[in-house]
From Swiss-Prot:
Main location (coarse class): plastid
Cofactor(s) demanded: Mg(2+)
Gene assigned in the entry: CPS5
Domain free text: The Asp-Xaa-Asp-Asp (DXDD) motif is important for the catalytic activity, presumably through binding to Mg(2+).
UniProt GO molecular function: ent-copalyl diphosphate synthase activity; magnesium ion binding; terpene synthase activity
Name of the featured protein: Ent-copalyl diphosphate synthase 5
Compartment(s) where it occurs, according to its Swiss-Prot or TrEMBL record: Plastid, Chloroplast
GO cellular component, one term: chloroplast
Catalytic activity line of the entry: (2E,6E,10E)-geranylgeranyl diphosphate = ent-copalyl diphosphate
Family matches, as InterPro entries: Isoprenoid_synthase_dom_sf (IPR008949), Terpene_synth_N (IPR001906), Terpene_synth_N_sf (IPR036965), Terpene_synthase-like (IPR050148), Terpenoid_cyclase/PrenylTrfase (IPR008930)
Additional observations: Abietane diterpenoids (e.g. miltiradiene, abietatriene and ferruginol) accumulate specifically in the periderm of roots. The ent-kaurene diterpenoid oridonin, main constituent of Isodon rubescens, accumulates in leaves.
Highest taxon in the source lineage: Eukaryota
């Protein structure tokens, strides 16, 4: 495995930290065994030539425990009379960092309770092994580190250490990873990548299995990268918390109290030397799933957002755990578009540019790859899927445009720009090809609501004229054809509304044998009679639920059955309430009022509070008679679309429209 330049390490990515550490370890091993002297000499030559480059490397990319492991290896090399330069400025910095780290976790503490130093024992002198062996993991390792465990075996001849190493040497055909297992980390990050790439719908059983596996390992103190760990970290805990909560599992936000110092700072590990960008990034993402009253998540959101904003302002968004294609882009999107406002297709379109596939490299004790998390197959499939959806959306948009023109909706005040934005919001929220009926029903419903509102307001219709419009719709909803099929109506806008509802109802009747015409008409009658009071969200939710039936578990539950469910009424009330406030907020913003937002995603305190309550209603499972998750998600989907319109300025929305619908 020696590379052409005499070094050992990751062949695909050059990191001087990785190459020096691996090369010195291999040279020490070969010299100890007194074999392959020519390879040893090539390795020494590489180190003599490149040791001075340590001070050129970005310290954020220093491998885990490097500041402890390298000095220990150098001490061993000196005993073996291996001639390598040790007086470089970069090495002096490494030694200084070692002292800082060892002071953060004193020797007496590391012998009493599990700490991250268990992961980096190799070469440390003066250890009390009889005490450390009591901190051994269940699998025989020292915090799942083969190298740390190998050093322990060398010092103690412990049978469990030998068993751990032997099992993994056989498993990996003579070698071992830098850390193993990584089962929780792998399960969580694979799910996260599939979701952000827009592929999760293809792997729902596998994802449910992954999430259930993580839930079985969950503890009130959190988790780390592997099961049965006595040490927890905020990165895996935050990702686990977020995904478990999204999938309906009950997890307490109090878990994050274990990662908060007395001074109010959040940390990944106790005694850490530096703060990881991705750890704070995932804490920030987790905090956006907060429920009412979860003050620890309010603190977490504030701390992580401030940390990330400061890093971004300094152009310092480098991470100590991963070298990825566009981490600044990922963090920037999260800060600029909070989760409430993040429409699924928008997130996926940006992430397709940010995801590095095979080229993303993780930083552990050495550089390593996570093929189930980062691979080109995911990226290739995601791009194919996105392009397929985009092509369908573009065709639907052309059909919407034809419908708009044939119905002369422009004469009633509906502009083509508003038409495009309305369709885009529906398509970016409900994007799947198989949900075309729901998407088009949403788009046409929203378009007609805006058109009718514009007609009523800007034509300055009298109360009697509005009443006549509503009466005509209420009493004339059965299609009548005369003169060779030409549709007759006193009001062409009423005619368009009636035809649209009949068309939507007929689609469902033909596809699923379900007649939704009457409940759809009832929903419109309710909106028309109270349009000045809002009610847009209620009409959209009812339309979406009627078009999608009762969800996957209870396909085509009746409107009466849905409405009789107490959870349905709670969701409807919460959605209407927050959407009405968002509509008012948007109107004030457009009119130059006092609506304001800050970088943590705030609109108003009241709106944020009500969004948290809605999220809680949607993601929690109340009982076996709970609504289907797809139906519950419809409420949140509509609310998030309102939040998006209120949060993003018009320039941002226009940019998103171009990128999501039209950019290849």
């Amino acid at each position: 495995n020696q590379l052409a330049d005499g070094s050992w390490g990751d062949a695909g990515t050059f990191s001087i930290f990785d190459r020096i550490l691996n090369t010195l370890a291999c040279v020490v091993a070969l010299r100890s065994w007194n074999i392959h002297p020519h390879k040893t000499d090539k390795g020494i030559w590489f180190m003599k030539k490149n040791m001075c480059r340590i001070d050129e490397e970005n310290l954020e990319h220093m491998p885990i425990g490097f500041e402890v492991a390298l000095p220990s290896l150098i001490d061993i090399a000196k005993k073996l009379e291996i001639d390598i330069p040790t007086q470089t400025r970069g090495l002096q910095e490494i030694y200084a960092r070692r002292e800082i780290k060892l002071k953060k976790i004193p020797r007496d503490i590391m012998h009493q309770v599990p700490t991250t130093l268990l992961h980096s024992l190799e070469g440390m002198a003066g250890l009390k092994w009889e005490k450390l062996l009591k901190l051994q993991s269940e699998d025989g390792s020292f915090l799942f580190s083969p190298s740390s465990t190998a050093f322990a075996l060398q010092q103690t001849r412990d049978h469990n250490c030998l068993k751990y190493l032997t099992n993994h040497i056989h498993k990996f055909n003579g070698g071992v990873p830098n850390v193993y297992p990584v089962d929780l980390f792998e399960h969580l990050w694979a799910v996260d990548r599939l979701q952000r790439l827009g592929l999760s719908r293809y792997f729902e059983p596998e994802i449910e299995e992954c999430i259930a596996y993580v839930h079985r390992q969950w503890t009130e103190k959190g988790i780390c990268w592997a099961r049965n760990s006595q040490v927890e970290d905020i990165d895996d805990t935050a990702m686990g918390f977020r995904l478990l909560r999204l999938h309906g599992y009950e997890v307490s936000a109090d878990v994050f109290r274990h990662f908060k110092s007395d001074g109010g700072e959040f940390f990944c590990f106790k005694g850490q030397s530096t703060q990881a960008v991705t750890g704070m990034y995932n804490l920030y993402r987790a905090s956006q799933l907060m429920f009412p009253g979860e003050n620890i998540l309010v603190d977490a959101a504030r701390f992580s957002a401030n940390f990330l904003q400061l890093k971004r302002a300094k152009n310092d968004l480098l991470d100590k755990w991963i070298i990825t294609k566009d981490l600044p882009g990922e963090v920037g999107y999260a800060l600029d578009v909070p989760w409430y406002a993040s429409l699924p297709r928008v997130e996926t379109r940006f992430y397709l540019d940010q995801y590095g596939g095979d080229d993303d490299v993780w930083i552990g004790k050495t550089l390593y790859r996570m093929p189930y998390v980062n691979n080109n197959k995911y990226l290739e499939l995601a791009k194919l899927d996105y392009n397929n959806c985009q092509a369908l959306h573009q065709q639907e948009w052309q059909n919407i445009l034809k419908w708009y023109r044939s119905c002369s909706l422009g004469e009633f005040g509906m502009t083509e720009r508003s038409l495009l934005q309305t369709y885009y919001v529906a398509a970016a929220s409900v994007f799947e090809p198989e949900k075309s009926q729901e998407r088009l029903a949403w788009a046409k419903t929203a378009i007609l609501m805006e058109t009718i509102t514009s007609h009523f307001e800007f034509q300055q219709l009298s109360r009697d004229q509005k009443r006549a419009f509503i009466t005509e719709f209420e009493h004339d909803s059965i299609l009548k054809y005369t003169n060779g099929g030409r549709y007759k109506r006193r009001s062409s806008l009423v005619g368009t509304l009636v035809r649209t509802l009949n068309h939507l109802s007929l689609d469902i009747l033909l596809a699923h044998g379900r007649d939704i015409h009457q409940p759809l008409k009832n929903a419109w009658c309710k909106w028309l009679n109270s349009w000045e009071e809002g009610g847009d969200a209620e009409l959209l939710v009812r339309t979406l639920n009627l078009m999608s039936g009762g969800g996957r578990r209870r396909r085509w539950a009746s409107e009466e059955l849905l409405s009789s469910n107490p959870k349905h009424e709670q969701l409807l009330k919460a959605t209407i309430g927050v959407c009405d406030k968002l509509r008012l907020f948007l109107r004030r913003k457009v009119q130059g009022g006092n609506g304001c937002m800050n970088a943590t995603g705030m609109t108003t305190v009241e709106i944020e509070s009500e969004m948290r309550e809605l999220v809680k209603l949607v993601v929690t499972r109340s009982s076996s008679e709970d609504l289907d998750s797809e139906i519950k998600q419809n409420f949140l989907t509509i609310a998030r679309s309102f939040y998006y319109a209120a949060y993003c300025n018009q320039g941002t929305i226009n940019f998103h429209i171009a990128k999501v619908l039209f950019e290849k």
